[in-house]
């Protein structure tokens, strides 16, 4: 008895903004053509992010890889044609157009670890970096410009060096109180 070929992960390029629909269509095509044994998971890796709009905290999802869908599958002519026949699929990434290359196990592990880390804590939608120029939009230092010194994603706070009367003064601010320069 021969062992079934191993399912590997492939990256499929989709029209940007249609990743979810492509993933859903692909799942439906797999069922419709009775090819479940050739396919594993089909996913669009996302993370939950928090953005502050109009003073309100809102949760939304951000895609790790906009424009791409990850597909676990056994690569053969039938599975290749099935994926390529799904509307809004532009093709596979890696390898050649007729012989796509799977992503490495190391890359798969990195993606899965990132998905697990994301699990509980939503991240801020806007990411700040030390040295970046920001403008204070709220509070006693509104309309002042400053430079980010430290970022605390756990507490959603920044330490910003603001120039007050010609002197650089460190000020602790909430993410909602600043906007990118």
UniProtKB/Swiss-Prot annotation:
A biological process (GO) of this protein is:
DNA-templated transcription termination
Alphabetic keyword roster: Transcription, Transcription antitermination, Transcription regulation, Transcription termination
Q: Which Pfam families match?
A: KOW (PF00467), NusG (PF02357)
Q: Which residues are in the KOW domain?
A: 130-161
At the top level, the lineage of the source is Bacteria
Q: Which SMART domains match?
A: KOW (SM00739), NGN (SM00738)
Matching entries from InterPro entries are given as:
KOW, NGN, NGN-like_dom, NGN_dom_sf, NusG-like, Rib_uL2_dom2, Transcrpt_antiterm_NusG, Transcrpt_antiterm_NusG_bac_CS
Q: Which GO terms describe its cellular component?
A: cytosol
Q: Which Gene3D superfamilies match?
A: 2.30.30.30, NusG, N-terminal domain
Query: NCBIfam families, alphabetically?
Result: nusG (TIGR00922)
* Subunit (UniProt): Monomer. Interacts with the transcription termination factor Rho and with RNA polymerase.
Similarity-based family: Belongs to the NusG family.
Q: What does this protein do?
A: Participates in transcription elongation, termination and antitermination. In the absence of Rho, increases the rate of transcription elongation by the RNA polymerase (RNAP), probably by partially suppressing pausing. In the presence of Rho, modulates most Rho-dependent termination events by interacting with the RNAP to render the complex more susceptible to the termination activity of Rho. May be required to overcome a kinetic limitation of Rho to function at certain terminators. Also involved in ribosomal RNA transcriptional antitermination.
Put simply, this protein is called Transcription termination/antitermination protein NusG
Annotated source species:
Yersinia pestis
UniProt lists the gene as: nusG
């Amino acid at each position: 008895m021969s062992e079934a070929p191993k399912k590997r992960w492939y990256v499929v390029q989709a029209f940007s903004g249609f990743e979810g629909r492509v993933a859903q269509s692909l799942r439906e095509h797999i069922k419709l053509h009775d090819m479940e044994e050739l396919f594993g998971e089909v996913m669009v890796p996302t993370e939950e992010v928090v953005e502050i709009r109009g003073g309100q905290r809102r949760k939304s999802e951000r895609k790790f890889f906009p424009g791409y869908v990850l597909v676990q599958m056994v690569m053969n002519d039938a599975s290749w044609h099935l994926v390529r026949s799904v509307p809004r699929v532009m093709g596979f990434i890696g390898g050649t157009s007729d012989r796509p290359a799977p992503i490495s196990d190391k890359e798969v592990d990195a993606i899965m670890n990132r998905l697990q880390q994301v699990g509980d804590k939503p991240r801020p939608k806007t990411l700040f970096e030390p040295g970046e120029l920001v403008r204070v939009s709220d509070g006693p230092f509104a309309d002042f410009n400053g430079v980010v010194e430290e970022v605390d994603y756990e507490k959603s706070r920044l330490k910003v060096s603001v120039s007050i009367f010609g002197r650089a003064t460190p000020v602790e601010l909430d993410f909602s109180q600043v906007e990118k320069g």
